[in-house]
Amino acid sequence: MSSITKEQVVEFIANMTVLELSEFIKELEEKFGVSAAAPAMAMVAAGPAEAAPAEEEKTEFDVILKAAGANKIGVIKVVRALTGLGLKEAKDKVDGAPSTLKEAVSKEEAEEAKKQLVEAGAEVEVK
């Protein structure tokens, strides 16, 4: 029996038609119990999965106090109620605007906090 080199096998495969190559791959899959499609599918699936987060609706939001506005005392009261901070800490947050008041909260909670702060006269951003 003559010995066949890798180069000869590669050359033989390179000269096959697409149909012959497809049948050859199927035979190899059956003989060795493997699937040539699995790695390709994983790569194809990984592409859209990476792009999907940009298209998905955001589920966690941050409430950021941009400015206290004219009613600083009212804003401090709302900040205390929303965050559970003491008077001094809440005042420091308001004085240090822009500052993040709530992080990684639901959309509903973020919108409610924004509503309360805006009613008190604050300028608020939800990210």
Curated annotation (Swiss-Prot):
Coiled coil: none annotated. This is Large ribosomal subunit protein bL12. The modification N6-methyllysine is found at K77, K88. Forms part of the ribosomal stalk which helps the ribosome interact with GTP-bound translation factors. Is thus essential for accurate translation. Gene3D superfamilies: 3.30.1390.10, Single helix bin. One of its GO terms (biological process) is translation. The lineage of its organism: Bacteria, Pseudomonadati, Thermodesulfobacteriota, Desulfovibrionia, Desulfovibrionales. It comes from the Bacteria. Homodimer. Part of the ribosomal stalk of the 50S ribosomal subunit. Forms a multimeric L10(L12)X complex, where L10 forms an elongated spine to which 2 to 4 L12 dimers bind in a sequential fashion. Binds GTP-bound translation factors. One of its GO terms (cellular component) is cytosolic large ribosomal subunit. Belongs to the bacterial ribosomal protein bL12 family. Pfam families: Ribosomal_L12 (PF00542), Ribosomal_L12_N (PF16320). GO terms for molecular function: mRNA binding; structural constituent of ribosome. The keyword Ribonucleoprotein applies. Keywords: Methylation, Ribonucleoprotein, Ribosomal protein. The keyword Ribonucleoprotein applies.
